[in-house]
């Protein structure tokens, strides 16, 4: 494993001299625009494991993506190698269809401290809830970014992340009531404490999310990648392309339904992913909004 290979994978060619916020942001943005958030291994007969060497080989050599435990673990390793003050945290993701936070800690986060200020660096959420810049860990402060306005709120040592979105313009009216569309203007994303975590704390969750019939990830094949002006997502056979602030305070969301024979080419053309095994797309209704 080496940093040169990782940066070749993400296309980052900037300076590595300073462990500052500007460099961190640039490295982070290259990661989220090159490495998809995806769970395709589950739906093509592969097992997801959390050994760093396996994650590195999958993302850097095989040019795949991963979910939070893979993306953020790899990014955390990179930042630590560069000399950043880096640690892992664990979050409980909000389920909009149950209107409740998960009871299992399934989301791995990176915390970075720069000149005494703490930032959350999360390269593993995907779709419109994917931050584009590290977020300062302060309570009650609106932090506007291209995807929308993010905000942390702290209550009794628990931190909550929420996001305010823009209106959405959907040209294909057949999808105007899609269950993939978020209806609320303000959306809870996840909650977490500042207790340091290790990758080993997520071993049970990694197996559970791949195997449980109750897991979102067994119900939907997901591949999503941030672009320079929005993001793409392939959920089952449904391809969406979102452009942020297409018009004032409005995002453009385009929907297409793919045929089986179009999925493989779309993964290659839109997400730069080539799978070694045959993907079996799945999209059980509910449980997930983009």
Curated annotation (Swiss-Prot):
Q: Which Gene3D superfamilies match?
A: 3.30.2140.20
User: What is its EC class?
Assistant: transferase
Tell me its EC number(s), please: 2.3.1.5
The organism named in the record is: Gallus gallus
- What reaction gets catalysed by this protein? an arylamine + acetyl-CoA = an N-acetylarylamine + CoA
> Keyword annotations for this protein?
Acyltransferase, Transferase
- Offer an example of a GO molecular function term for this protein: arylamine N-acetyltransferase activity
| PANTHER family the UniProt entry points to | ARYLAMINE N-ACETYLTRANSFERASE 1 (PTHR11786:SF8), N-HYDROXYARYLAMINE O-ACETYLTRANSFERASE (PTHR11786)
Query: Which protein, by its recorded name, is this?
Result: Arylamine N-acetyltransferase, pineal gland isozyme NAT-10
Q: Where is the active site?
A: 68, 107, 122
Similarity comment: Belongs to the arylamine N-acetyltransferase family.
Among InterPro entries, the record links this protein to: Arylamine_N-AcTrfase, Arylamine_NAT_domain_sf, Papain-like_cys_pep_sf
Q: Which Pfam families match?
A: Acetyltransf_2
Identify the domain of life: Eukaryota
């Amino acid at each position: 494993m080496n940093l040169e290979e990782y940066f070749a994978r993400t296309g980052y060619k900037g300076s590595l001299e300073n462990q500052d916020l500007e460099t961190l942001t640039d490295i982070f943005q290259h990661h989220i625009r090159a490495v998809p958030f995806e769970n395709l291994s589950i739906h093509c007969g592969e097992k997801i494991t959390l050994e760093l060497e396996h994650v590195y080989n999958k993302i850097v050599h095989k040019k795949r993506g991963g979910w939070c435990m893979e993306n953020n673990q790899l990014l955390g390793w990179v930042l630590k190698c560069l000399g950043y003050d880096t640690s892992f945290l664990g979050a409980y993701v909000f389920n909009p269809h149950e209107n409740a936070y998960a009871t299992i800690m399934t989301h791995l986060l990176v915390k970075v401290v720069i000149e005494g200020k703490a930032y959350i660096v999360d390269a593993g959420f995907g779709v419109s809830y994917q931050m584009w810049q590290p977020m300062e860990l302060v309570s009650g402060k609106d932090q506007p970014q291209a995807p929308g306005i993010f905000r942390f709120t702290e209550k009794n040592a628990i931190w909550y992340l929420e996001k305010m979105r823009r209106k959405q313009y959907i040209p294909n009216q057949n999808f105007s009531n899609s269950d993939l569309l978020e209806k609320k203007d303000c959306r809870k994303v996840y909650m977490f404490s500042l207790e340091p975590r290790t990758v080993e704390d997520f071993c049970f969750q990694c197996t559970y999310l791949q195997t449980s019939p109750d897991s979102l990830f067994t119900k939907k094949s997901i591949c999503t990648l941030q672009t320079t002006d929005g993001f793409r997502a392939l959920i089952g056979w449904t391809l969406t392309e979102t452009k942020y602030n297409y018009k004032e305070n409005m995002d453009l969301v385009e929907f297409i339904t793919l045929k089986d024979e179009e999925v493989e080419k779309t993964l290659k053309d839109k997400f730069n992913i080539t799978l070694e095994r045959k993907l079996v797309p799945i999209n059980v209704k509910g449980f997930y909004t983009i």
